[in-house]
A protein has these predicted regions:
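Short, low-complexity, intrinsically disordered N-terminal modules
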Residues: 6-9
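Mid-domain alpha/beta scaffold segments of enzyme catalytic cores
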Residues: 13-282
Length: 282
């Protein structure tokens, strides 16, 4: 594999990527890391640059939490168009937007749909509901359905914050609108809902908590490898890792998946990268 590099002003040189990797002290296999869900804009400017400059990472899908977040990610993408892919959405674990804010977000998505790779992070506020049992879910469900519709309008996949009891609600909405591409990030649910999920074409991603969380390990063991992706949800902290060292987190997830499925490490790594690229059409 060859890439072009500018070693002197005005002169283009071809560099062998495998040779470059070896000279930098890591194998080509370790360059096949793709973070399918992170909050890049929430990192410090220094860590953003470190993450985007990490040669072990071939790409990343940065999700947004609101319109301001999406705009910042789009600006970053203009600097790193070959490595950074972005999603636009509204994280559900926060107060709902007012009408004006909501319309502004959807208008922005309509205007920039060709620059984004997904609608996300969107979903339902499971953890907020757990803290406030009186939380009205109806407007959140309505907002999720609208995100589903705009994803369908522009043929974009969904990057979803859907866990536990909310899985059935989401699956019903996705089926209602005949959605084929939905990515359930950091997926976990009960056995009954998991069986429903198995009958769909949807994907799930695994975080570093697979190292110790039996629920995440269960997903890795029982979902086909060709429907799995890896993620960090950075800067969310994971025990034993610094949030900025994303490549180390991703490598640890792949290694654990290979162990749980009793498969060769390189095969798992290649397949998960392929899964992500095909799902997001990169």
């Amino acid at each position: 594999m060859w890439i072009l590099a500018l070693l002197e002003p005005g002169k283009g040189y071809k560099i062998n990527l495998k040779l470059t990797a070896l000279l930098c002290g890591f194998s080509l296999e370790n360059t096949m890391l793709f973070d399918s869900h992170l909050h890049l804009d929430q990192l410090s400017d220094e860590n953003i640059q470190k993450t985007l400059g990490d040669l072990k990472i071939t790409g990343m899908l940065a999700v947004s939490t609101n319109l301001k977040s999406a705009k910042k990610l789009l600006n970053l993408k203009q600097t790193y168009p070959e490595k950074l892919y972005i999603a636009a959405g509204f994280h559900p674990e926060q107060s709902l937007l007012n009408l004006e804010e909501r319309e502004e977000l959807f208008q922005w998505i309509d205007e920039h749909h060709s620059s984004i790779s997904a609608i996300g992070e969107v979903g339902l506020p499971y953890y907020s509901k757990r803290e406030n049992l009186n939380l009205d879910y109806a407007p959140y469900i309505a907002l999720l359905e609208r995100f589903i519709l705009i994803a369908k309008k522009w043929d974009l996949p969904l990057n979803l914050h859907i866990v536990h009891n909310d899985v059935d609600i989401a699956l019903e909405l996705l089926e209602k609108h005949n959605i084929q591409r939905a990515h359930f990030h950091w997926f976990k649910t009960d056995e009954k809902s998991f069986q429903k999920f198995l009958s769909t074409p949807y994907f799930a991603s695994l975080t570093p908590d697979i190292l110790w969380n039996p629920k995440t390990q269960y997903v890795a063991q029982h979902l086909s490898l060709n429907r799995l992706m890896i993620e960090t949800d950075s800067p969310w902290p994971h025990e034993g890792f610094e949030s900025a060292v994303i490549s180390e987190q991703l490598s640890a997830v792949i290694k654990k998946v290979a162990e749980l499925k009793s498969l060769p490490l390189h095969y798992v790594q290649e397949q998960m990268l392929l899964n992500t690229q095909q799902f997001y059409r990169l």
